[in-house]
């Protein structure tokens, strides 16, 4: 079962029959709380568009995916791809909020490559969709996504993240997407 930073500190201390000693790590986690919430909000507020843009991106790069015999044909396969991409994004946000990848690893990535292989889902297209999703999410966290880039789909964040404060959160989010890519490779 995935543990948040506090539960992990208590379990670790209990296992060594000592008091919680990693107070500095807990302080740092608490201090990053608002940044995490802002980052997750930036992703969640744009999730639907991010998912559809990631899938549209792989279709633009490979029109064969939506042709008869392609992996996004017929519509039920396309819908399943959108659903799976949304699930991946959702678990990345859970990991980002918790500051821990175990929920992502345990609930989304464990056996993902094998499942996709058994279903005949091309991992190269899936990896490319996750790469696009990563770029979109990081742009929203950093506030570098603009109306000019996103067009009518653009949703401005209510609370823009301060550039120097969001670099570590953006890097952490990118790392969770990289875990997804590694699990599919």
Curated annotation (Swiss-Prot):
Residues noted as binding (2R,3E)-phycoerythrobilin 2 in the record, renumbered to the chain: 81
Membrane protein topology class: Peripheral membrane protein
GO cellular component annotations of the record: phycobilisome; plasma membrane-derived thylakoid membrane
Protein localization: Cellular thylakoid membrane
Pfam families: Phycobilisome
Positions bound to (2R,3E)-phycoerythrobilin 1: 49, 60
Biological processes per GO annotation: photosynthesis
The entry's keywords: Antenna complex, Bile pigment, Chromophore, Electron transport, Membrane, Methylation, Photosynthesis, Phycobilisome, Thylakoid, Transport
Protein family according to the UniProt entry: Belongs to the phycobiliprotein family.
Protein name in UniProt: C-phycoerythrin beta chain
Source species: Pseudanabaena tenuis (strain PCC 7409)
